[in-house]
A protein has these predicted regions:
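Hydrophobic packing and interface segments
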Residues: 4-555
Length: 555
């Protein structure tokens, strides 16, 4: 069949427009596309710095020595896991490099310089993915001990604040690093080879995500089942210090629920951006419009990354007002509120920034049509967690049905109930994504082809993926919340802090409060339940984004 795209067009054929020529008129001032991206990247460098500041704050939180030792052991095991994964990634890259060399030299006839650039930026993309994964594990293993110790104060809000800070640190670090890397490629790499560099970058990200996501998911299940087998066979309690599998289980929580999703999010965020840039440069003939749309995409990402950080502060202030004097509250409420606040800010910013940056184009309706499409993705990022909570929350009637089935029907009915519930939840989540993509499809048919060509609907699907990750720091934050709360409970038990002689007097003398061990256990268990729920809410968002973004990339 024939279409308006070049027959063999790909990322390697990208010809990025001259960003010095595109101009924007903002609040009475004129700024070039290049300058807009440069100053936007400086703002994002600030959010990157803020993520490191949050990490520093978590690192300095008070922790009892017994808990610190357990956390250090977990980190050491995580470190061993990541080093092993790094070796595997290098072997995988060597294999892929051979395939790329055969393809570029043998089938396309590219020069050594071109192939070297693809391989170089593949390494950069893979290193970025690996770096984010390592940072996430380091933050989490500081936060788990701090959370466990904070629970002894008898103030439930402290138990929520620390994992939230850790998650936001990881989320802002991931998205900010990705944005800075992509803007550096756009601004400082010669525009004739930007396509090649983006191609290599996307390959490297995908390699990192495929290995870290899949291997992490498998590792956590093996470790979890192994630890449970020890518990069943030897009739010992959960997180018993005599069970060596508990440390492996804690490592698996980080490998499967922190390393995997962060590497996955890093790859999806980057590949979606590359797909949208590819579409714009191939489908839009006018270089000035190309520059405007590319800057619009990054401008939206700059603002949404910043607003995600703002949503964190707003939510912290509301939580302090509501819960600072309470002994009991629903630990899921602050997390869901964070998602809703971020979504409201991001949807508002979508319409504002679209009007500001592309409101003066020939088609005066283009800005709000594109804003509606992006908002469909943002709505998905809010509604998917709500749909998931219906099936995974400790307050869910469906979860209580499985408890009843386990009590009255044994293992077989428990498994059947879980399978039915899982399929049922996937059906509704899938239906939601399809419904929002349908809205985007019909919106793209409202005259967008005049600017974006006859395949505007493909661009619309990419924008849905873009919208789903527009508040990426928050999505990653609520996902990273889970392994911290899960590990915190294990750190508490493994430290055996209650059995240490004169521990109450020691803590009161050194830290200035009398520990309440029973309340601490209760808070950690309730918080673990909330963490388990929300790390499951983030997975469908990341998977849905990956599928939608990949659809755009393929076409």
């Amino acid at each position: 069949f024939c279409c308006s795209f070049p027959l063999f067009a790909s990322e390697a054929d990208l010809a990025i427009p001259d960003l010095h020529q595109g101009t924007f008129h903002i609040f009475g001032s004129t700024i070039s596309a290049w300058d807009f991206l440069f100053y936007g990247a400086l703002v994002i460098a600030g959010t990157l710095g803020f993520s490191l500041y949050l990490f520093h704050r978590i690192k300095k939180l008070p922790v009892h020595g017994s808990m610190q030792k357990v956390a250090a052991t977990i980190y050491k095991t995580c470190q061993t896991y990541l080093i092993q994964q790094g070796k595997f990634l290098l072997m995988l890259f060597a294999l892929v490099a051979i395939v790329l060399c055969v393809y570029f030299f043998g089938l396309i006839g590219q020069t050594v310089s071109v192939v070297a650039q693809v391989l170089l930026f593949s390494v950069i993309g893979m290193a970025g993915s690996y770096c984010v994964a390592w940072f996430g594990i380091r933050v989490n293993t500081y936060a788990n001990a701090s959370t466990a110790f904070a629970s002894l104060r008898g103030k439930p809000l402290d138990v929520v604040k620390i994992p939230s800070q850790a998650g936001m640190s990881v989320g802002l670090f991931l998205i900010s690093l990705e944005l800075v890397m992509m803007v550096v490629i756009l601004l400082f790499v010669p525009r004739e080879i930007v396509g090649i560099c983006f191609l290599g970058f996307a390959i490297g990200e995908s390699l990192g995500a495929s290995a870290l996501r899949i291997a992490g998911g498998i590792f956590t299940k093996i470790a979890d089942i192994g630890s449970d087998l020890m518990k069943v066979v030897f009739k010992i309690k959960e997180d018993d210090p005599r069970n060596p599998g508990v440390i492996a289980d804690c490592t698996g929580d980080n490998a499967g629920d922190s390393v995997g999703p962060t590497a996955d999010g890093f790859e999806t965020y980057g590949v979606t951006g590359v797909a949208l840039i590819t579409f714009i440069t191939l489908a839009v003939p006018d270089p000035e419009i190309q520059a405007k749309l590319i800057v619009w995409i990054f401008g939206m990402r700059f603002v949404m990354d910043f607003l995600s950080g703002c949503a964190f502060f707003v939510n912290q202030a509301i939580s302090k007002k509501l819960y600072s004097k309470k002994d009991q509250f629903d630990f899921e409420a602050p997390l869901m509120r964070l998602i809703v606040i971020a979504a409201i800010l991001c949807i508002s910013a979508t319409f504002f920034m679209s009007y500001l940056l592309i409101g003066d184009m020939t088609d005066s309706t283009l800005w709000w049509k594109l804003a509606i499409i992006i908002s469909c993705g943002t709505l998905a990022a809010v509604l998917i967690p709500e749909f998931t909570k219906i099936f995974t929350s400790s307050h869910s009637k469906h979860v209580k049905e499985i408890v009843t089935a386990s009590r009255e029907g044994g293992a077989s009915l428990n498994i059947l109930s879980g399978i039915v519930l899982g399929n049922f939840s996937a059906f509704w989540t899938g239906l939601l994504i399809v419904a929002l993509m349908t809205i985007a499809f019909f919106t793209s048919g409202m005259g967008l082809d005049a600017v974006l060509g006859e395949h505007a609907s493909i661009f619309a699907f990419g924008l849905v993926a873009f919208g789903m990750l527009c508040m990426g720091p928050v999505t990653i934050a609520v996902d990273s919340y889970g392994p911290v709360t899960d590990n915190a409970q294990s750190v508490f038990e493994l430290s055996q802090i209650e059995t240490i002689p004169d521990i109450k007097e020691s803590i009161e003398k050194e830290y200035g409060f009398t520990p309440d061990f029973e309340k601490g256990k209760h808070y950690l268990e309730a918080n673990d339940s909330a963490g388990n729920t929300f790390k499951e809410t983030a997975k469908p968002v990341l998977i849905g984004t990956a599928v939608t973004g990949a659809t755009t990339m393929i076409f």
